[in-house]
Structures are given as C-alpha cells and as structure tokens.
Amino acid sequence: MGSRPGIFQYPLRIDWMTKFAVRSLVYHETVPGHHFDLAQVVENKDLPAFRQLGTFGFISARGEGWGLYAEHLAAESGWYEDDLEGLLGELWSEEFRARRLVVDTGLHAKHWTRQQAIDYGIEASEVERYVVLPGQAPSYMVGELKILELRDKANKALGDKFSLKEFHNMILDTGIVPLEILERQTDAFIARGRRRI
C-alpha cells in the first residue's frame, strides 16, 4: 500500500455526502482504490519515470475505472456483509455513475439542455463539470466495465489457473494506461498463464 501514509479528507458538507455512501467512497478513494493504485504506480520501478509521475496526466477510464471497480470488489468480497446501509451506498454509487453515462451522452451527443441534465437527477455543479470535461464522467463506469470484462476474459481463458490476485497485480503493475493497452496486457497475462498450464 505504499511506503508513505495517505491522507483521506472526508467532506463535511452533510448536504453533499450522504452517510450511507461513506464506506463506498472510502473504498474508492483509499484501499483498494486510488491510494492503493497510485502508491503501486509511484513505487513501481519497472515503469518509466514519466509514467510514475503522471507527466501525461491521469487517464480517467483506467484510473477512475479502478476506483469504481474497488467499490464493486469490496461488495463482491463481502465487506458490506453486516452493513446493509453501506451496501446501499455502493449500489447508489453504481447507479449514480450510470446516470453520468446517460447525462454526458445526452449533453454532448443528443444536444440536451442544462435543465434536461439537471432533471435527470444530476446537480447543476456536476452538469457544469460534464460540459467542460466531455467524456470524463462516463469514464468511471466505462473503466470499471472494461476491467470486469478483462477479468472475465482471463478467468474463462485460464480456468482453474486463473488467480484474481495475479490479475489485480497485472493491472496495478501496468499502471494508468489507456484501456486498449490494458487489454493488450491482459492478453499477454493470459498467454503467460497458458504457458504454465
């Protein structure tokens, strides 16, 4: 999880953050989410320095995709087992990211008005963010779905030899890259796994 501690600052605006979404947000932003992911990238000496430092910026679909996948992974791993409120928060988070897909597409491809986006259940400040960052809002779910697709592909290809831990290590060791490169890395992961069979 890195050699240095991370700092997570929780927003105290009660109107902005609902209590039931806290655990999901923590998993997204800390462990197994962004903090864990970025700590791996920064400390991975096999990556070129410019990729460790994020010189070319944060590639949203892979980065935010991992964050949303971390929320999913927490639910899948039973981390909400005794916390129905937390599970509700995770489901709300998934649904919110799905609405983002619709609203961003509506604004940029279907010529929606600002009010149509707000009427779809997205706050005005969020809508303004989507207007100036086309494609960023849907990148969370696009990235998560791609990671799940690649995981399923590797699992089917490798069968009993598939290791979820090794798959996660491959993603984290690859770093923050475009999804096409992550797919190529997954194909290489499968090829290496088949040679072991």
PLM segments and residue spans:
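N-terminal maturation segment of proteins
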Residues: 1-197
